[in-house]
Amino acid sequence: VLIALGRWLQHSGYRVGVISRGYRSQALDEARQVAPNDDSASVGDEPLLIRRELEVPVVVGRDRLQALHTLIQDNAIDIVLSDDGLQHYQLPRDLEIVVLDGQRGLGNGRLLPAGPLREPRERLEEVDWVLERNSDDPHSGFEYHISGARHLASGRLVVWSDCLGQWGDQTLTAMTALGQPEQFFQMLTTQGLTVKTVSLPDHDVIMPQHLTGIVTETVLITEKDAIKLSGSIDSRLWVVEIEVQLPASLLTGLHDKLPTRVQT
């Protein structure tokens, strides 16, 4: 969602910057700007993916306020997007967007550790927008769409309709280290693909030993998995290109709330 929002802001003429904690990265104690050639162990997989996809300044660090100061001090920025920063109350903000899974909702509605919530559900009444994946609500619902697949070793990109024609009668392997892997697997099966699924712990790296014993000719992974790979690449790996279509009501609302960008 953040990448889709960042792209829309860029197309609207805004200079975008991003701050993030950089989960499981080595760059936590002091704010650090992410370089395109960094590795995920140093800065975190999600910040590195954001940096490469949007080609905008990204700063990681445990102290979000320090990360913000580093970002705006070193770069010309119109809008700062904070990745997963709702509870960082020292961080000033103009707009708040919460993203939920429409199927999971708020779980049992209880706060950690008894439930999944970081704050009471009433907090949602204070934010500017609540977006829900897998929701039929035209104002808040959004979906992920598969646009194609990229052969990781060669970089060859194939549109999704051609992928379905090529793989429709095959059994594939889908492997990922996402926190909610079932969403990725479901996206593939609803497209009519037959997949054997392999789930790794969230943020883990797909290693050669994970691929040992897999007999299928094609292994599908996500961009978040691919960003962590280096060295020799298994020729069976294909990266599924997934895009987010943001609800029109959000984009219209942002257009009305954001200041007009004056081109210089």
Where are these regions (language model features)?
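Conserved beta-strand elements of the Class I
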Residues: 17-19, 98, 172-175
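Hydrophobic residues at beta-strand termini and immediately following loops
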Residues: 100, 142, 198, 240-241
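Phosphate/Mg2+-binding loops and adjacent switch elements
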Residues: 22-138, 148
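Acidic beta-strand-to-loop metal/phosphate-binding motif
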Residues: 218-224
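C-terminal accessory "lid"/substrate-recognition subdomains
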Residues: 105-218
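Walker A (P-loop) phosphate-binding motif
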Residues: 1-36
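Short, high-confidence coil segments that cap the C-terminus of an alpha-helix
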Residues: 14-15, 75-78, 169, 216-217
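Short, flexible loop segments at boundaries between secondary-structure elements
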Residues: 201-205, 236-263
